[in-house]
A protein has these predicted regions:
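Metal- or metallocofactor-binding catalytic centers and their adjacent structured scaffolds
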Residues: 1-46
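Glycine-rich, proline-tolerant flexible connector loops at the mouths of alpha/beta enzymes
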Residues: 22-27, 95-109
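Glycine-rich, aromatic-flanked loop segments that form ligand/cofactor-binding clefts
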Residues: 36-72
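Short, structured patches in soluble enzyme cores that scaffold and shape functional sites
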Residues: 38, 69-71, 98-100, 128, ...
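Active-site mouth loops of central-metabolism enzymes
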Residues: 62-78, 127-133
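Active-site glycine-rich loop that binds ribose-phosphate moieties when present
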Residues: 77-81, 108-111
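Catalytic domains of carbohydrate-active enzymes, especially glycoside hydrolases
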Residues: 85-97
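Catalytic core of soluble alpha/beta enzymes
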Residues: 101-212
Length: 212
């Protein structure tokens, strides 16, 4: 089980002083956790704050990392309120989840939102979580393009590399891979995936993709 396997990897590290990258590659959350702990120990040993894993402007508090604020799909009033809250909190980029309600209704909401918040005020990204079928995806992407979107995450379900690659070539909205990357831990398979799909962006999650 997970706990026993994690214990084994920690015991191996304690015995050898080295991380078993090949053995841990199929378990990205464990690898991320162990690497983070190691960086923390190394920072402490060098006299730095153990929470400051690297020496750079971000950890020194001189430069932020820009992120997007997540806004779930709802009615227009709810979404406007959430967007206003994000803007008040300093966000200038939001990500909207789409694909959970009628597509025309989502387009209507996006139109109202974009009319209120122009591209110079708010950057909008959308995440379909694989909700589109391949045969309908390009039509939907063309309709979404009128809202000056930064990108769309995972328009179709995972495991369709050739079809996703075709969409990346033709889509007027840049495509980001998210779920497509999860579980792809072998380096040669990762390379093959990227060479086949040629995505515009990657959504990297250390605890899901393995390590720092």
């Amino acid at each position: 089980d997970y706990t026993s396997l994690l214990r084994k990897f920690c015991d191996d590290f304690e015995r050898t002083g080295k991380i078993d990258y090949e053995g841990m590659r199929p378990y990205p959350s464990m690898l991320f956790g162990l690497e983070t702990a190691l960086f923390s120990v190394q920072a402490s040993a060098s006299g730095r704050n153990p929470h400051h894993l690297f020496e750079n402007a971000f950890y020194e508090g001189r430069r932020p990392i820009l992120t997007n604020g997540l806004v779930w799909m709802g009615n227009y009033d709810e979404m406007s309120k959430r967007i206003d809250e994000k803007l008040d909190n300093g966000f200038r980029c939001i990500k909207l989840k789409i694909g959970s309600i009628d597509f025309d209704s989502e387009l209507s909401l996006l139109k109202k939102i974009r009319n209120r918040y122009g591209p110079s005020i708010l950057e909008i990204r959308v995440d379909a979580n694989g909700a589109f079928g391949y045969d309908e995806a390009l039509v939907k992407l063309n309709r979404l393009s009128s809202f000056h979107l930064h990108s769309i995450e995972q328009p179709i379900p995972t495991g369709q590399w050739e079809k996703m690659g075709d969409l990346c070539k033709k889509s007027p909205v840049p495509i980001a891979l998210d779920e497509e990357l999860i579980g792809i831990n072998n380096i040669s398979i990762k390379s093959s995936l990227l060479d086949t799909i040629h995505p515009h962006y990657l959504v990297l999650k250390p605890s899901l993709h393995g390590g720092m």
